[in-house]
């Protein structure tokens, strides 16, 4: 479903940061200021947001993987919820340096987590002493928190979706190094450099974050549904061709 400018206004997408913290590279997307707060031009944001969603739909239709990244307190739950709804990986606790650029090391940790989860399923905890079980549970909880959202990622994602590029500078830098496209919400206090699909907007409001993340998740589901429909139509077309030539 298409997002309207009214929805963006209601979610507070247009509220930037205090004028003294601004980044001049965001000047083209700023409408003005009110009470020393920059106001983002939603007439710029809306089409750029729609361009980002169009790219997301195409990527999802081609079975691409989009990694959701949002580790700030006000975005953690929404990022996990919407990524799971879209069947995509996510990072919502802390970005571990090398998550993309040193994926081999991450794979070792993912294997450890999966082995530990399998051990729990098999009832191995009951065979341990109380102390061993406690240490085991602590380790598995730590791994689930830090890499649970990426345990089924399988490889480098085809794109990353980031809320707050300043807070997730390392994630953006790693994606840039590997040539992984970056879709990101950029507030008035950060630079849009290194971002392929810029969404100028408030990156602090939980309502605004929910609007962005829901839109991206919806676009992924739409892209996949469209791809399935195209396959069904193609199969039907082939069947009709066979019947006509029978």
From Swiss-Prot:
Belongs to which family?
Answer: Belongs to the universal ribosomal protein uS2 family.
Q: Which species is this UniProt entry from?
A: Burkholderia mallei (strain ATCC 23344)
- UniProt cross-references to InterPro entries, sorted A to Z: Ribosomal_uS2, Ribosomal_uS2_bac/mit/plastid, Ribosomal_uS2_CS, Ribosomal_uS2_flav_dom_sf
Q: Which Pfam families match?
A: Ribosomal_S2
List the protein's name.
Small ribosomal subunit protein uS2
Q: Which UniProt keywords apply?
A: Ribonucleoprotein, Ribosomal protein
Cellular component (GO) terms are: cytosolic small ribosomal subunit
Keyword Secreted among record annotations:
no
List GO molecular-function terms, semicolon-separated.
Answer: structural constituent of ribosome
Record GO biological process: translation
């Amino acid at each position: 479903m298409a997002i309207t400018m009214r929805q963006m206004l209601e979610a507070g997408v247009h509220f930037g940061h205090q004028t003294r913290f601004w980044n001049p590279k965001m000047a083209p997307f700023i409408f003005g200021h009110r009470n020393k707060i920059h106001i983002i031009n939603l007439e710029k944001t809306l089409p750029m947001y729609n361009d980002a969603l169009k790219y997301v739909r195409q990527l999802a239709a081609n079975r691409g993987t989009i990694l959701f990244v949002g580790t700030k307190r006000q975005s953690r739950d929404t990022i996990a919820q919407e990524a799971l709804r879209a069947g995509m990986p996510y990072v919502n606790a802390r970005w571990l340096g090398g998550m993309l650029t040193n994926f081999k090391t991450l794979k070792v940790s993912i294997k450890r987590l999966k082995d530990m989860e399998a051990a729990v399923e098999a009832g191995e905890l009951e065979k341990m002493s109380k102390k061993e079980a406690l240490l085991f549970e602590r380790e598995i909880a730590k791994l689930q928190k830090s890499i649970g959202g990426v345990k089924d990622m399988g490889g480098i994602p085809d794109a990353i979706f980031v809320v707050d590029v300043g807070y997730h500078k390392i994630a953006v830098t790693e994606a840039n190094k590997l040539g992984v496209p970056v879709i990101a919400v950029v507030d008035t206090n950060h630079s849009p450099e290194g971002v392929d699909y810029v969404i100028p907007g408030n990156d602090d409001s939980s309502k605004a974050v929910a609007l962005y993340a829901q839109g991206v998740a919806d676009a992924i589901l739409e892209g996949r549904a469209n791809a399935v429909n195209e396959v069904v139509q193609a199969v039907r077309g082939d069947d009709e061709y066979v019947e006509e030539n029978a």
